[in-house]
UniProtKB/Swiss-Prot annotation:
Organism ancestry: Bacteria, Bacillati, Actinomycetota, Actinomycetes, Mycobacteriales
Region (Disordered): 463-482
Pfam families linked to this entry: Hexapep, NTP_transf_3
Catalytic activity: alpha-D-glucosamine 1-phosphate + acetyl-CoA = N-acetyl-alpha-D-glucosamine 1-phosphate + CoA + H(+); N-acetyl-alpha-D-glucosamine 1-phosphate + UTP + H(+) = UDP-N-acetyl-alpha-D-glucosamine + diphosphate
Top-level taxon in the UniProt lineage: Bacteria
Entry protein name: Bifunctional protein GlmU
Keywords: Acyltransferase, Cell shape, Cell wall biogenesis/degradation, Cytoplasm, Magnesium, Metal-binding, Multifunctional enzyme, Nucleotidyltransferase, Peptidoglycan synthesis, Repeat, Transferase
Organism in which the protein naturally occurs: Mycolicibacterium smegmatis (strain ATCC 700084 / mc(2)155)
């Protein structure tokens, strides 16, 4: 049996998730830059099942758009089945089966939308194990030191599975069992359909439990097998924010380790957070306190951090980014950024450029080799190559109603405290004096100076601040001790 021709996957995402205590649907809470449901759908899409169904119920009007987005992103159809009333997992699976063609006769894989670390290898192993035998159902199990909240696996003395008992219905003796149901199964569809029609809700939660299918199949003298997963994190579900945080740490450690094995030096894995879609080139060094988020792309031989957060930022080979907060920006090869630099969306720094201490940029293009060393705001601007912007300069882009653009050419040198009142253009090779307020265009090669001649008013301190410390110091410097 092959997964691509014989399997359908049903993902259960209909529950209310009340223990999350959140306005956000549980399956949309994120780990490593992806929602839990996105993690699961990414995984199940990789096994190339013939049909993929998401069962939605509570908050489906908010979850359905995410399913549609993922369907487009993954390039495959994801059917949506609706569970209008939350009557239990058995009822949810029955709703999911209604989305399959009536003549589908293959294997049905069932998983939950809140098992974010489930991987392709584990699912493939389940499908292979189930397809190679005569079992009507195969259950993924794992062993937990604290199984509280999970259904327990009931076995005979010969270790055959005879049932699954939910926590609420378990006896004290059964609650000591540490082998648990993960909520991931493979079924033959005919046996599954038959068993679902016989589910009863006479249990502690008055629901139709999918787990009761195991006992029904055993009563039908059908074989039920278990496939044990040693790495319990792969099949651990999330019910509250503590579990979300715990699994997030596990996933982050695995992401960090994968980058390390691929040739990235990460000084302190415990303080470094890297989202699942981030790419990092070989021989890059990541220092403590760094977060690389979203679709960030970092080249080879870079230095990132410490204390740096980059979200959807592309960093070229050999760049250095220190104590910087950046989003939706591009940093060119060999460029230097930081410390204490703020890159807002739309920043594009060219190769070998520099953005130094306490520089903020937004919606700007800064050319190759251009330097903005310190204490400057650059917004809505285009700067050419190999220019230098003096300290404490401001690109004055907003008049209270409209934002305008500033254009600065190549090989320009601007003095400290230059104000660029947009819209304004500074031509190639031009200079500005310190303290200049530019309201008019500057021709190529010109020097722009807006400040008037300096006036020194002799004796002003003696007249206006007589007897002050300044007056005494001035008199002493002038040799007037009177």
């Amino acid at each position: 049996m092959t997964a691509s021709t014989e399997a359908a996957v049903v993902v259960l995402a209909a529950g209310a998730g009340t223990r999350m205590r959140s306005d956000t649907p549980k399956v949309l809470h994120t780990l490593a830059g992806r929602g839990m449901l996105a993690h699961v759908l990414h995984t199940v899409s990789e096994i190339d099942a013939r049909h993929l169904v998401a069962v939605l119920g509570h908050d489906r009007e908010r979850i359905a758009p995410e399913v549609a987005r993922l369907s487009e992103e993954l390039g495959r159809a994801i059917d949506v089945a609706v569970q209008d009333q939350q009557l239990g997992t058995g009822h949810a699976v029955n709703c999911g089966l209604t989305a399959l063609p009536h003549d589908f006769a293959g294997m049905v894989v069932v998983t939950s939308g809140d098992v974010p670390l489930l991987d392709t290898a584990t699912l493939t192993g389940l499908i292979t194990s189930h397809g190679s035998g005569d079992a009507a159902a195969t259950v993924l199990t794992t062993t937990l030191p604290d199984p509280t909240g999970y259904g327990r696996i009931l076995r005979t003395q010969d270790h055959e599975i005879i049932g699954i008992v939910e926590q609420a219905d378990a006896t004290e003796s059964q609650r000591t069992i540490c082998e648990v149901n993960t909520g991931v199964y493979a079924f033959d569809i005919a046996d599954l359909r038959s068993a679902l029609t016989r589910l009863r809700s006479d249990n502690a939660q008055h629901e139709l439990y999918l787990t009761d299918v195991v006992e029904i199949l055993r009563q039908d003298h059908r074989t039920v097998r278990a496939l044990h997963v040693d790495d319990s994190a792969l099949v651990t579900g999330v019910n509250d924010r503590v579990q979300l945080s715990d699994l997030g740490k596990v996933l982050n450690r695995r992401i960090v380790a994968a980058h390390q094995r691929a040739g990235v030096t990460i000084i302190d894995p415990g303080s470094t957070w890297i989202d699942i879609d981030v790419q990092i080139g070989q021989d890059t060094v990541v220092h403590p306190g760094t977060q690389l988020l979203g679709a960030t792309r970092v080249g080879s031989h870079c230095v990132i951090g410490p204390d740096t957060t980059l979200t959807h930022v592309t960093v070229g080979d050999g760049a250095s980014v220190v104590r910087t907060h950046g989003s939706e920006s591009v940093i060119g090869a060999g460029a230097t950024v930081g410390p204490f630099t703020y890159l807002r969306p739309g920043t594009n720094l060219g190769a070998d450029g520099k953005l130094g201490a306490f520089v903020e940029t937004k919606n700007c293009t800064i050319g190759t080799g251009t330097k903005v060393p310190h204490l400057t705001y650059v917004g809505d601007a285009d700067i050419g190559e190999y220019s230098n912007i003096g300290a404490s300069s401001v690109f004055v882009n907003y008049d209270g109603e409209n934002k305008s653009r500033t254009t600065i050419g190549s090989h320009v040198r601007t003095g400290s405290d230059t104000m660029f009142v947009a819209p304004v253009t500074v031509g190639d090779g031009a200079y500005t004096g310190a303290g200049t307020v530019l309201r008019d265009d500057v021709p190529p090669g010109a020097l722009a100076v807006s400040a008037g001649p300096q006036r020194n008013i002799e004796g002003w301190v003696a007249k206006k601040r007589p007897g002050s410390a300044a007056d005494k110091a001035a008199r002493k410097a002038l040799g007037d001790e009177s």
